[in-house]
Amino acid sequence: MVSYKEAGVNIEEGYKSVDLIKKHASKTFTKGVLNNLGSFAGMFELPKYKNPVLVSGTDGVGTKLDIAFRMKKYNTVGIDCVAMCINDILCHGAKPLFFLDYIACGKLEAEVAAQLVEGVSNGCIQSECALIGGETAEMPGFYRDGEYDIAGFAVGIAEKDEIIDGSKIEDGDILIGIASSGPHSNGYSLIRKLVEDLHKDFEGNKIGNTLLTPTKIYVKPVMKLLEKYNIKGMAHVTGGGFYENIPRMFKEDFTAVINKKSYPLPNIFSHLISLGIEEDHMYNTFNMGIGFVLCVNEKDGENIIKDLIEMGEKGYKIGYVKKGDKSVELI
């Protein structure tokens, strides 16, 4: 007789991981959560909205995970997972409600799984949303030992008549960029080709640790700005960089004109250019120091930037909108 454990699935380790995970998830619970982890499904009571619309998004972390494997640092990529989902739904003005995660591995290590969920929990706390469920899948022979994948699913809410869909964007509106924390979770397949020694010094730190800096979550500053200003469009700068993501906020045919010298380029991107990536290709791959973009009336620009600074963020007027063909023009 062959046991499940002999087939590569350790049920006891699974029970241990669940116990470790529960304490991290419970820290994220908000008043809408109706049950604890361990049920067949998570339940969340919707707040009182006049005409509510649920806004959802799903994403993963990609090959940034390989940096985490090699550095044996597992408690930050969970933040990335949350950020990649939450920042997307934020683009439509949605307030995050709850999050679910999915972790897959070849051999389950409870302590590693707990570190992953610790990161997810921290990301949810930053996003002011609840981690109400998830799945940890142990699949022997499918993943190599020591490797795993993580993905997430976020749900937010917005009043129907307050959804931001780009329909109010006009010729002459300005673009405000909010600084990123680094490459975030995109471009790592290219980074891994160029950066072989992750323990090499970079500005007093191992470059592997620098590359594991978590993706910035923009919920708190953006939700505060939405209370005061007419924000017409928003873009989360992810894979595809400026060229692919900024036009996604446009409902009509506009061109985003971006001044590359309007903000300081972070050193990590200058370093990647020095390793042999063409600058134009960088803007089509990385966020280049700007992780989130707002489209607003020109008259609000200075005050928005002041408010961002007061909230501890770095904001810059990086360009403007003109009639065009849903494209980006760098100057």
UniProtKB/Swiss-Prot annotation:
Annotated EC: 6.3.3.1
Superkingdom of origin organism: Bacteria
Protein name: Phosphoribosylformylglycinamidine cyclo-ligase
Reaction catalyzed: 2-formamido-N(1)-(5-O-phospho-beta-D-ribosyl)acetamidine + ATP = 5-amino-1-(5-phospho-beta-D-ribosyl)imidazole + ADP + phosphate + H(+)
PANTHER family: TRIFUNCTIONAL PURINE BIOSYNTHETIC PROTEIN ADENOSINE-3 (PTHR10520:SF12), TRIFUNCTIONAL PURINE BIOSYNTHETIC PROTEIN ADENOSINE-3-RELATED (PTHR10520)
Database matches in InterPro entries: PurM-like_C_dom, PurM-like_C_sf, PurM-like_N, PurM-like_N_sf, PurM_cligase
Keyword entries, A-Z: ATP-binding, Cytoplasm, Ligase, Nucleotide-binding, Purine biosynthesis
Pfam families cross-referenced by the UniProt entry: AIRS, AIRS_C
Compartment(s) where it occurs, according to its Swiss-Prot or TrEMBL record: Cytoplasm
Pathway: Purine metabolism; IMP biosynthesis via de novo pathway; 5-amino-1-(5-phospho-D-ribosyl)imidazole from N(2)-formyl-N(1)-(5-phospho-D-ribosyl)glycinamide: step 2/2
Recorded family membership: Belongs to the AIR synthase family.
Biological process annotations from GO: 'de novo' IMP biosynthetic process; adenine biosynthetic process
One GO term describing the cellular component: cytosol
